[in-house]
Design a protein with these regions (language model features):
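Pocket-lining segment of extracytoplasmic ligand-binding domains
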Residues: 27-29, 37-38, 102-180
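Short secondary-structure transition/capping segments
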Residues: 20, 42-58, 97-100, 129-132, ...
Length: 180
């Protein structure tokens, strides 16, 4: 029987509670559970990894061509996911690699779809979207507005990898969203 989960954190909790025998979980959330950090008050036991399915990318999306680096997000309105969500902590990790905190931006807390709508309507400057590329929220936005992905440079990627071993460096090919 197929069941719909409520996200990685809830899925881990259901495994531990015994209400699920098998569940999907993002690698960062699994690390939080194992280490008892961020989404988890203490170390979680009673789960293990079976397989990795696909890679999700931390995508920083904007319709403003002047925003080229994460540092350019300072003072800008940025959707960083729901408070306490995996996206939220990914955003905090990436901002931190650039010496920025949540206080350095004007944070909004929105879903992928709401973030794309807010970008389309000019209500926010950028959004963190964590999903496999391509993802519908970005694809749909790119069909209606000039859309840009903000890149991380190698110096700051190295800083991020030093503190968060659940990330890996990857490149999203230009043609994934923007054609040739």
């Amino acid at each position: 029987m197929g069941l719909v989960g409520n996200g990685s954190q809830a899925n881990v909790q259901e495994l531990v509670d015994g209400t699920a025998d098998f569940a999907f979980c993002q690698s960062d959330v699994m690390a939080y559970a194992y280490n008892g950090t961020n989404l988890f008050e203490s170390k979680v036991e009673g789960f293990s990894t079976v397989a990795a399915l696909y890679m999700e990318q931390v995508q920083i999306v904007t319709t403003n061509p002047a925003i080229k680096t994460v540092a350019d997000l300072a003072g800008k309105s940025v959707s960083i996911g729901a408070p306490g969500s995996g996206v939220y902590f990914n955003a905090i990790d990436v901002l931190g690699a650039y010496g920025l905190t949540e206080d350095d931006i004007k944070p909004t807390y929105q879903s992928f779809g709401d973030s794309a709508d807010a970008l389309k309507n000019g209500q926010i400057d950028a959004a963190f979207i964590v999903a496999g590329a391509p993802t519908t929220a970005v694809t749909d936005l790119a069909t209606t507005k000039d859309t840009y992905l903000v890149s991380l440079d190698s110096e700051h990627i190295a800083k991020l990898l030093e503190t968060s071993d659940y990330y890996t460096e990857t490149v999203i090919a230009k043609d994934v969203y923007f054609g040739d």
